[in-house]
Amino acid sequence: MTPPPDRPRRERPTARTPQRSARPPRRKPLDPARRAAFDVLQAVRERDAYPNLLLPVLLRERGISGRDAAFATELTYGSSRVRGLLDAVIGSAANREPETINPVLLDLLRLGTYQLLRTRVDAHAAVSTTVEQAGIEFDSSRAGFVNAVLRTISTRDEQSWVDELAPDRSVDPVGHAAFVRAHPRWVAQSFVDALGASAGELDAALAADDDRPQVHLAARPGVLTADELAGAVNGDVGRFSPYAVYLPSGDPAQIAAVRDGHALVQDEGSQLVARALTLAPLADDQGRWLDLCAGPGGKTALLAAIAVGSGARVTAVEPAEHRADLVVQNTSGLPVDVLQADGRSTGLEPGFDRVLVDAPCTGLGALRRRPDSRWRRQPADIPALTRLQRELLASAIALTRPGGVVLYATCSPHLAETIGVVGDALRRHPVIALDTRPLFEPVADLGDGPYVQLWPHRHGTDAMFAAALLKLDT
């Protein structure tokens, strides 16, 4: 009889041969930078958190600094900013709609895909770290799915994926530009509509939303000049606003002039809007100025600082308690009265000389400052916002004396929020449009008027819109 084959003998453990655990080895979790980015993406999805607000807190709490902090910032802001493009690539590589993928897995895939397409991270490291985290969060099956998708993505560069997935430029030029620049198509279309005859600038306008915005400071009039502030912070005097200084680097919160209230952090476009109201031609200015949508108080502070020189006093209206408190803090020592109230029903006595309506809006003009905001807003948001804007502008006009000026402003170029709202006011209320362009001198390239539309790619500011209206005597 043929003897049975030898079976491997199991050795008893000895002191020299320790027995191995039957449990699989614990996978190494994500490094601190990737972990922070992953946690922020989950918080955005689950709690509607804002990446630009949450990430600095996490970095500080976890002691992440230097290169790790820079990497976490790049992953978080970058993957948030180009989410639409990443999802299109992920969907193609996975052969399924991104919406059908587990949301946590999709967050991981976005981080991995961003590293593969937009960074110099080694492809193997980008894939392996993401797969390992998928195994920790789920199981080997899900980790295998992540591995397969990322390996497919890693076989091609971004341009190759864009060439395959972007709409045909000759058929849908707006859709093509929106895909390439990672914007929702409706946002790109709103830029085209606002650019009008300059629609050929669409790509430049979209690209500017991906540029890191330079920090702008405003020197407080009557206290500090722009030249003095620039010298103190080693910055450059602004191109347009007489108060503006461009900060090349560093944390503005650490600047002594900012801490002391002698300067504030404010985009140059916002400075120009506040200044424009004070430059509007007005007979017999009695010094009653109103900021109807004041929170958090940046424009109010600049208005009030200018008001000091003319003997005017500013009333600031803000409905939200915490934002009204910020107005109080930001205008300390200035001639400002803060009223917590809805701007549509303030209870104030009419007769204001100059009124600013910096209305709540979609914020499409400041997409470069908030990495995920282009994906937060939807076209369905527009009707409610424009209704609020019309009501606020109507209230402002009612509070303005005959011969007084209202300056309506938004940080959005969307025509429904700009000329649509202003046009409605011109039809319904006793106002006429002034040529707003002279109020923004020395800014050039402002078009045919009578309104002003700033653009990041032209002026280096947020895309602020402004319209000056003169109230008639009825």
Whereabouts are the PLM-identified features?
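S-adenosylmethionine
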Residues: 1-474
